[in-house]
Regions:
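Phosphate-bearing ligand-interacting subdomains
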Residues: 1-3
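Phosphate-binding loop of NTP-binding sites
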Residues: 5-148
Length: 148
């Protein structure tokens, strides 16, 4: 899967390198934080795209997503759309599932925000224990979010 994410990054021409990437992770507050960062960047004159729980936004466009952090092929396709639309920044929610499933492979974030960590998302469909969840969130500062 990691190789696939990096391959899709190359397939779409490395769109994340054409924008300032801001990644937001944490148990709670990702959506609110991404909206606030987007508003600040827009007020500063940037053309901003946003990817997360509420979908994809870029000037004049909005559409829904199935996942907070889309699968790697879909994510790279979205980033290409944002870059082609002239976005110079992208603010995105980065879920622990997105990290665990290598959906963000190939993306280097210039800015990383870690909101908080609570013992949520524990169960058969997500993380087997809080320790595992904490480990994946912690990986944000190493492999998945290497530019932090």
């Amino acid at each position: 899967p990691l190789r696939h994410g990096a391959a899709f990054h190359r397939l779409f021409g490395r769109p994340a390198l054409e924008m300032t990437m801001v990644g937001v992770t944490g148990t709670k507050g990702k959506t609110t934080t991404t909206h606030m960062i987007k508003a600040v960047l827009e007020a500063a004159g940037h053309k901003v795209g946003m990817v997360g729980t509420n979908g994809v936004y870029y000037p004049g466009h909005h559409y829904d997503l199935n996942n907070t952090t889309p699968e790697s092929y879909e994510l790279q396709k979205i980033l290409r759309q944002l870059a082609d639309a002239g976005c110079d920044a992208c603010v995105m929610e980065v879920s622990s599932q997105g990290i665990m499933m290598d959906r963000v492979a190939g993306i280097h974030y210039k800015v990383g925000v870690f909101t908080n960590l609570y013992p949520d998302h524990i169960g058969p469909g997500e993380h087997s224990s809080f320790e595992e969840y904490r480990s994946w969130k912690g990986s944000c500062s190493s492999a998945a979010m290497s530019a932090w």
